[in-house]
């Protein structure tokens, strides 16, 4: 078993626990010595804090990674009430790249599909279905039927 929890299921009640998550790198942000990634799986996403610049600098969007770390409360003022995992973050102690991704034909984390032709979306359907709206539609369809 790779993971102990799903990314979207982590809450404040998990603070202090060491967990292992597996998922895709949705976004990476570097802030002088510390990097933040949004780790996404089918259940949602969670912010991961990486102190090792060398490791974080190599990560790219849609790389599949395995992260082990401790759930901590976000510093005051950095909470994000618009997402369920906005109170917490995972302080990474170990990161393993499971699979690298080729350069993407379009951004997966953006909701804007106006600049992406239908032909490209169909050709790369496996990427298109990772986007929030199509994934939500499939989930709803699965629940209804």
Model features per residue range: what roles?
Residues 1-145:
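Class II aminoacyl-tRNA synthetase catalytic cores and aaRS-like
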């Amino acid at each position: 078993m790779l993971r102990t929890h799903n990314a979207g299921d982590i809450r404040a009640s998990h603070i202090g626990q060491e967990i292992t998550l597996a998922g895709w790198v949705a976004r990476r942000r570097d802030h002088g010595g510390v990097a933040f990634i949004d780790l996404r799986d089918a259940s949602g996403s969670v912010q991961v804090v990486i102190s090792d610049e060398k490791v974080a600098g190599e990560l790219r969007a849609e790389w599949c990674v395995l992260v082990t770390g401790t759930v901590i409360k976000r510093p005051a003022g950095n909470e994000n009430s618009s997402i369920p995992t906005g109170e917490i973050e995972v302080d990474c102690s170990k990161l393993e790249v499971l699979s690298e991704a080729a350069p993407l034909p379009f951004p997966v984390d953006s909701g804007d599909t106006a600049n992406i032709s239908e032909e490209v979306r169909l050709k790369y359907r496996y990427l298109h279905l990772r986007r929030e709206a199509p994934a939500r539609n499939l989930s709803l369809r699965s629940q209804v039927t």
